[in-house]
């Protein structure tokens, strides 16, 4: 039985004498995910494997390989963040030709549904639907369906104008009227668009602008149904020029009684990735198992969520210290599609994002991912184009990463060198307390000058009452320069360092 004091990995600990201990696992394949039971009397952990619907832990035939159990122990928190232990315990890349795998910076039809402005569903006419029997053609549109032709074109135009690679579109396919909470097996077919989403015309329009659409496959956790349609769904993507899919596993797993972390599901997640590779499709899996470094073996697994991402800011808010914890926990196993970039902190549903704009900018550096979203509405960025410039400039693939300072839940400052470039980017996030960072630029190439554009919280900034207060300064710097930067609680700073 999983204990009331049990915990999930990756677990970050700190002893009274300042030793940092990180516990996780690596190379989780054909095996149930591990949790840790805690005996709070003896303070000892015991491995607890996620059972299947029958209560069995797993089925293996010898010889077999179990996942690695990992421990990172250090007196310097930065070394936890820079460790490649988990990644290196995975097998080398198994995909022979990786030329089709690439980093992606994207916008999307997503935040407006999450924050209460729009909806995934097309109509309110039907409280329940059947994929092969509901007449959507004659249904009355609700007027709130976000994935419509005009709105998607608006996002495509915005992406093209500002140099983004792609546009994610959620809610394009039939079935969203009763997708959640009913444990329907045949909930989506991943093939049939709503009447107001012209899949052919929209992809042609996007491609004419130098932009691609990102497919969305919400499974509602009906994984057997997804596997039934998977090949046809991937082929549809190739037919229309998609090369990336965001998959989702919201809700209780079907087959009923299975768990997101049981052996059956672990095998399904990897099957979806390996089958996608056959079609040259990159996968960004949300609500799946927390990563264990498999992106080394299967680099088309370009992103994962598997933790409280930005969407929870629209579900009542997340404490500011959260983004100073995730790199020590969730990101130990691989990159996270955190979906940062919120500029308007007050959501249409009454929730508030507990961050400043500069705190959001910093996440593009501190939260590693080769898949980065600018999640807010185009109109919210257009009000702050000077701050938005950092999102346009920041790289998503790196040659080198350095952690300048770090303390779990309090602050993290990272510097990364853009891949194939002399440019660097720095990001710093804070938790529940204000923090002053002393940033030594000695990682820059000696003898070279850089134009530093510094985005930092204004003195009056407050993540609750004044989150849009920021100051932008420019100066010429070298490897001898030292910057002192003040961040408010829930805030941060971002710096672009462009080589001259």
Regions found by a protein language model. Name each.
Residues 1-96:
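N-terminal accessory beta-strand-rich subdomains and adjacent acidic, glycine-rich linkers
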Residues 61-162, 166:
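An acidic-aromatic substrate-binding cleft motif
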Residues 159, 283, 366, 426:
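Conserved, mostly hydrophobic/aromatic
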Residues 171-356:
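Aromatic- and carboxylate-enriched substrate-binding clefts and catalytic-loop regions
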Residues 358-405, 494:
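Catalytic cores of secreted or luminal carbohydrate-active enzymes
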Residues 408-451, 493-494:
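Carbohydrate-binding surface patches
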Residues 454-480:
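Solvent-exposed beta-strand/loop surfaces of large extracellular or lumenal domains
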Residues 474-500:
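C-terminal beta-strand-rich structural cap/linker in extracellular carbohydrate-active enzymes
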């Amino acid at each position: 039985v999983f204990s009331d004091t049990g915990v999930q990995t990756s677990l970050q600990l700190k002893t009274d004498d300042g030793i940092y201990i990180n516990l996780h696992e690596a190379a989780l394949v054909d095996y149930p995910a591990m949790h840790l039971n805690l005996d709070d009397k003896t303070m000892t952990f015991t491995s607890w494997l996620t059972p299947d619907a029958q209560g069995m832990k797993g089925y293996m035939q010898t010889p077999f390989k179990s996942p690695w159990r990992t421990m990172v122990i250090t007196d310097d928190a930065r070394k936890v963040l820079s460790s490649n232990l988990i990644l290196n315990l995975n097998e080398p890349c198994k995909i022979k030709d990786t030329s089709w795998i690439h980093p992606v910076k994207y916008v999307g039809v997503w935040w407006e549904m999450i924050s209460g402005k729009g909806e995934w569903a097309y109509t309110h006419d039907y409280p329940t639907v059947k994929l092969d029997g509901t007449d959507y053609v004659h249904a009355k549109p609700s007027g709130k369906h976000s994935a419509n032709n005009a709105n998607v074109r608006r996002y495509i135009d915005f992406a093209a104008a500002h140099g983004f690679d792609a546009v994610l579109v959620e809610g394009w396919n039939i079935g969203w009227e009763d997708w959640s909470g009913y444990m329907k097996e045949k909930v989506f077919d991943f093939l049939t668009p709503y009447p107001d989403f012209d899949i052919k015309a929209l992809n042609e329009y996007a491609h004419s602008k130098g932009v691609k659409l990102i497919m969305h496959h919400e499974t509602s956790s009906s994984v057997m149904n997804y596997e039934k349609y998977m090949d046809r769904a991937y082929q549809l993507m190739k037919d229309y020029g998609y090369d990336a899919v965001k998959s989702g596993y919201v809700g209780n797993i079907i087959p009923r009684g299975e768990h997101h972390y049981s052996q059956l599901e672990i095998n399904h997640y990897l099957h979806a990735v390996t089958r996608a590779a056959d079609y040259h499709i990159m996968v960004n899996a949300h609500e799946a198992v927390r990563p264990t470094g498999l992106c080394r073996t299967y680099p088309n697994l370009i992103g994962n969520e598997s933790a409280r991402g930005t969407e929870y800011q629209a579900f009542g808010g997340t404490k500011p210290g959260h983004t100073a914890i995730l790199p020590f926990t969730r990101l130990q196993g691989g990159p996270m599609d955190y979906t940062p970039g919120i500029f308007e902190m007050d959501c249409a549903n009454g929730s508030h994002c507990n961050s400043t704009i500069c705190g959001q900018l910093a996440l593009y550096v501190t939260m590693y991912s080769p898949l980065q979203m600018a999640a807010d509405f185009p109109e919210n960025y257009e009000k702050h184009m000077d701050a938005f410039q950092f999102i346009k400039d920041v790289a998503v693939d790196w040659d080198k990463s350095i952690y300048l300072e770090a303390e779990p839940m309090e602050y993290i400052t990272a510097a990364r060198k853009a891949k194939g470039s002399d440019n660097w980017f720095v990001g710093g996030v804070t938790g529940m307390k204000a923090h002053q960072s002393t940033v030594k630029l000695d990682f820059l190439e000696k003898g070279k000058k850089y134009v530093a554009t510094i985005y930092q919280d204004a003195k009056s900034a407050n993540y609750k009452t004044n989150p849009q207060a920021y100051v932008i300064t420019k100066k010429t710097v070298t490897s001898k320069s030292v910057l002192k930067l003040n961040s408010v609680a829930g805030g941060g700073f971002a710096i672009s360092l462009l080589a001259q």
